[in-house]
């Protein structure tokens, strides 16, 4: 806004917005509504935060006539068996998307549809698991409440000390703003966005320091983790976080310190007291750790 950029938010539900951001309510699954809003607003940049259906991306590529479409994706990479992922590790898929897709599969197909366009001006931001205040997945709450109760935390022995795929919501927002800056050459490129060098162990120990308690980690084989015990995994078959070289070099992105993210997230936790559904199995976890 300080640079004279008008920001317009949108979604299916009408919402009251403040002085500096206006709002357009529409259903993106209805092409006529999407076309109407894009025609009326005529955005230079379209930031797509929530899409994981390839048909909706295809509609955007047909109807958006601006300068840059920024698609927020996820860790679309194949299993890399503990190697940090680089942007080029994702290869667009062959064939046509199936009728039913989970979130990860949907994001992969969305990126595939973008890659199949000829000249469409897309840019992709790829965050891994995102946490921060009001995290609707409650995954970060799973670790906060387990550290707070003083019992042991079950972690995957194969992967808890290697770099994990984690990002702070503010860092992802900053990366999106950088990607929306038309002065940067991000034409038809993807960018990794995450913490750097932060493992699951670092996360848990950071939470414990912020709470003033001693962390109690109990490593066990990944395959033996009870459901919901460690929502961030990490699955040892997956990538060990991201390589951030391209985002640094081309966008000017730098990840924040873990401590800054935890301070803000812990303040939310202490007020809201959220609980992850997997915490219902806490007695089973304690029994596995021999602490029941």
What are these model-derived regions, one by one?
Residues 5-12, 16:
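Conserved glycine-rich Rossmann-like NAD(P)H-binding loop of the short-chain dehydrogenase/reductase
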């Amino acid at each position: 806004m300080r640079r004279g950029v008008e920001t317009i938010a949108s979604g299916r539900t009408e919402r009251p917005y403040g002085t500096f951001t206006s709002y357009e309510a529409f259903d993106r699954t209805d092409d006529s509504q999407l076309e109407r809003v894009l025609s009326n607003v005529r955005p230079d940049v379209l930031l797509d935060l929530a899409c994981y259906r390839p048909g909706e991306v295809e509609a955007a590529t047909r109807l958006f006539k601006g300068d840059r479409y920024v698609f927020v994706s996820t860790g679309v990479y194949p299993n890399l068996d503990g190697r940090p992922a680089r942007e080029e590790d994702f290869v667009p898929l062959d064939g046509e998307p199936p009728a039913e897709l989970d979130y990860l599969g949907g994001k992969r197909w969305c990126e595939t549809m973008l890659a199949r366009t000829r000249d469409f001006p897309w840019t992709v931001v790829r965050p891994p698991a995102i946490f921060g205040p009001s995290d609707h997945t409650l995954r970060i709450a799973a670790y906060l409440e387990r550290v707070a109760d003083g019992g042991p935390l079950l972690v995957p022995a194969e992967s808890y000390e290697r770099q994990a795929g984690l990002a702070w919501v503010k860092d992802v927002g900053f990366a999106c703003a950088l990607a929306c800056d038309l002065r940067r050459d991000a034409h038809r490129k993807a960018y990794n966005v995450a913490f750097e060098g932060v493992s699951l162990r670092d996360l848990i120990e950071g939470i414990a320091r912020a709470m003033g308690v001693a962390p109690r980690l109990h490593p066990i084989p990944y395959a033996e983790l009870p459901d919901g015990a460690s929502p961030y995994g990490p699955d040892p078959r997956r990538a060990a976080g991201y390589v951030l070289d391209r985002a640094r070099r081309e966008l000017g992105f730098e990840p924040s310190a873990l401590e800054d993210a935890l301070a803000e997230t812990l303040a939310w936790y202490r007020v809201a007291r959220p609980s992850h559904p997997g915490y219902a199995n806490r007695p089973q976890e304690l029994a596995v750790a021999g602490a029941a």
